[in-house]
A protein has these predicted regions:
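Active-site microenvironment of metallo-dependent hydrolases
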Residues: 1-220
């Protein structure tokens, strides 16, 4: 009754309307030093164990790999650095270590990081982490991967979570990122960016990383 035809012959009759993008990115580019972790003689450190296809994680307590007074990634044992960068204000980078991503080189970063949607990144070294995070900051949100002499980034200008671009083009760009992360960087996860996006979600056990540091859901 008094209806309006909005689609016909598989084509929309609705007029497109442009809207401004909503976003908030108030962090400046980082430097490599921001991602370094001091070694204080720890015998063991808490390590997040990411599980393929799962939102939960396990806690492992492992012997850290130290080099020149710093705790560094141990790619031979798949213990990599994970960081969370506060995107809403200037703050120190939160750092920890994670097992299960399988990266042999480079880093990946994302501003899709439930629920606060800060920037979360995993990488084999501080230089790669810095590059990946700064790509996301430059785009004011998105997904990035660096390594093997290449840099890939998918900008997500709407709140750092979504794109206002063509859906098919965005899907192709995401597929390229996903394949690059697995084939070039060596990730063994089915969906590296999906797993990454839940590593800062504290309400799902057991060990996660927020912009304030590690959070153990079993003992808080």
């Amino acid at each position: 009754i008094n209806g309006e035809v909005v689609a016909e012959n598989q084509k929309s009759k609705l007029k497109s309307q442009k809207a401004g993008t909503v976003n908030k990115f108030s962090c400046s580019p980082k430097v490599e030093e921001d991602f370094k972790t001091e070694f204080a003689g720890e015998k063991e450190i808490p390590v997040i164990q990411a599980l393929d296809g799962q939102l939960i994680t396990n806690r492992l307590d492992l012997v850290p790999k130290a080099d020149n007074g710093k705790i560094v990634s141990d790619t031979e044992n798949d213990v990599l650095k994970i960081v969370v960068v506060n995107r809403y204000q200037e703050a120190p980078v939160a750092k920890a270590f994670i097992k299960g991503f399988g990266l042999k080189q480079g880093a990946l970063a994302s501003s899709v990081a439930h629920d606060s949607h800060n920037i979360v990144a995993v990488g084999v070294d501080e230089e790669s982490l810095c590059r990946a995070v700064n790509l996301v900051i430059a785009e004011q949100g998105g997904l990035s991967a660096v390594g093997n002499g290449r840099e890939l980034v998918l900008g997500l200008p709407v709140a750092g979570l979504m794109s206002n671009g063509d859906g098919y083009e965005i899907a192709e760009a995401y597929t390229r990122l996903d394949q690059f992360t697995k084939k070039d960087l060596g990730s063994t996860l089915t969906s590296p960016f999906m797993t990454l996006s839940f590593m800062a979600l504290l309400v799902i056990p057991h060990l996660k990383l927020s912009d304030k540091g590690l959070f153990d859901g079993d003992v808080f």
